[in-house]
């Protein structure tokens, strides 16, 4: 029975190792694709730019909506950041495990060198052996060849693990880059959210000031309205007072007119009396008395009753405004004076 060679064993083991390696690579690529699909940082995220603060309610409503939108985006970014950190931690754990396995396998002796030494020893024994002992030596040699094949498979598996480790390192680098981008975006959203909150606070304070000014203006308008009502009441009162004063003025003017008429009549009477005293009283007694009686028979003087009012004076007395007593007392004094002059 011919001896199996190491190269033939290696060729028989290689397809199985390649299939396992391809399966591992496909699993690794599927894991990367799943990671890429599950992580979509910042997709369709449009952060609004902040504008100037508006004191009108519509601007405040829009600003509040933008702040709530930013807060929701910030929460989504925090959740994605947490998932990225978990993926990075898992990748680090897998990397560490692969490094440990690779380190353990690197401490084992090199199976390729052992295979080469075994092949050289087998050829040497093949040349030196007797033909009758071929079957016996073949059975003895099959055990180390199978052992070498297992070690070669382990080596190939170690190489696959090393390739996986390299791919995992690339994945970790990519996750770190995405994590850095997410942290930057999270920081930017936080700053923008803080800026919008400050603008909202400024707008709220400005609206509060405007409302305070508005309340003050309303109170001023109310006070001015009350003052205007008071002024209207005062104006109406003054108008009534002015009307009453005008009525009193008209009454006084009428009284003054009557007094002027009476004064004119008194002046005429005084002139007549002076004329009588200066001219007609120079006659002797009886003639003078008779003439005096004749003179006063018209109603100016009555020796028994005193001085009489001239015609038309009684009506003026009746029309006077409360001055009848003063007029009568004045006429009595004038009559007494006239009587004394007559006795002389």
Swiss-Prot record:
Q: Which UniProt keywords apply?
A: Cell membrane, Coiled coil, Membrane, Nucleus
Q: What is the effect of changing residue 341 to E?
A: Localization greatly shifted to the cytosol
Q: In its keyword annotation, does this UniProt entry include Signal? A: no
Q: Does the UniProt entry include the keyword Coiled coil?
A: yes
The membrane topology noted for this protein in its Swiss-Prot or TrEMBL record is: Peripheral membrane protein
Segment Disordered: which positions? 1-74, 92-139, 186-218, 307-344
State the conditions that upregulate or repress this gene. Up-regulated by auxin.
Extent of Polar residues compositional bias: 196-211
Summarize the protein's role: Acts as a scaffold, mediating interaction of ROPs with different proteins. Required for primary and adventitious root maintenance, but not for their formation. Promotes the stabilization of ARAC11 on the plasma membrane of the pollen tube initiation site but not the activation of ARAC11. Regulates directionality of polar auxin transport, and is required for the formation of a stable auxin maximum and tip localized auxin gradient during embryogenesis, organogenesis, and meristem activity. Involved in exocytosis and in the recycling of PIN proteins back to the plasma membrane.
**The protein's assembly and partners:** Homooligomer. Interacts with ARAC3, ARAC4, ARAC8, ARAC11 and SEC3A, but not with ICR2 or EXO70A1.
- State the similarity comment: Belongs to the ICR family.
The molecule here is called Interactor of constitutive active ROPs 1
């Amino acid at each position: 029975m011919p001896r199996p060679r190491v190269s033939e064993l290696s060729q028989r083991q290689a397809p199985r190792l390649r299939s396992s390696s391809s399966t591992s690579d496909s699993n690794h690529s599927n894991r990367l694709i799943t990671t890429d699909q599950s992580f979509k940082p910042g997709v369709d995220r449009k952060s609004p730019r902040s504008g100037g603060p508006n004191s009108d309610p519509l601007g405040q409503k829009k600003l509040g909506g933008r702040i709530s939108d930013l807060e929701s985006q910030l929460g989504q970014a925090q959740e994605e950041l947490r998932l990225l950190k978990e993926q990075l931690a898992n990748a680090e754990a897998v990397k560490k495990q692969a490094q440990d396995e690779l380190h353990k396998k690197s401490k084992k002796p090199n199976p390729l060198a052992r295979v080469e030494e075994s092949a050289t020893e087998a050829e040497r024994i093949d040349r030196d052996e007797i033909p009758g002992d071929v079957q016996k030596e073949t059975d003895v040699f099959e055990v180390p060849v199978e052992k070498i094949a297992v070690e070669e498979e382990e080596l190939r598996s170690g190489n696959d693990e090393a390739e996986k480790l390299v791919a995992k390192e690339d994945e970790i680098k990519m996750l770190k880059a995405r994590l850095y981008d997410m942290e930057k975006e999270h920081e930017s959203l936080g700053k923008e959210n803080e800026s919008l909150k400050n603008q909202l606070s400024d707008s709220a304070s400005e609206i509060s000031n405007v409302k305070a000014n508005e309340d003050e203006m309303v109170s001023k308008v109310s006070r001015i309205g009350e003052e205007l009502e008071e002024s209207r009441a005062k104006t109406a009162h003054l108008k009534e007072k002015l009307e009453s004063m005008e009525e009193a003025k008209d009454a006084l003017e009428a009284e003054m007119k009557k007094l002027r008429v009476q004064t004119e009549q008194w002046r005429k009477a005084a002139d007549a009396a002076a004329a009588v005293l200066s001219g007609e009283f120079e006659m002797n007694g009886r003639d003078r008395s008779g003439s005096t009686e004749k003179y006063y028979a018209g109603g100016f003087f009555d020796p028994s009753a005193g001085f009489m009012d001239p015609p038309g004076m009684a009506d003026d007395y009746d029309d006077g405004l409360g001055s009848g007593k003063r007029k009568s007392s004045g006429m009595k004094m004038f009559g007494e004076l006239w009587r004394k002059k007559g006795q002389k």
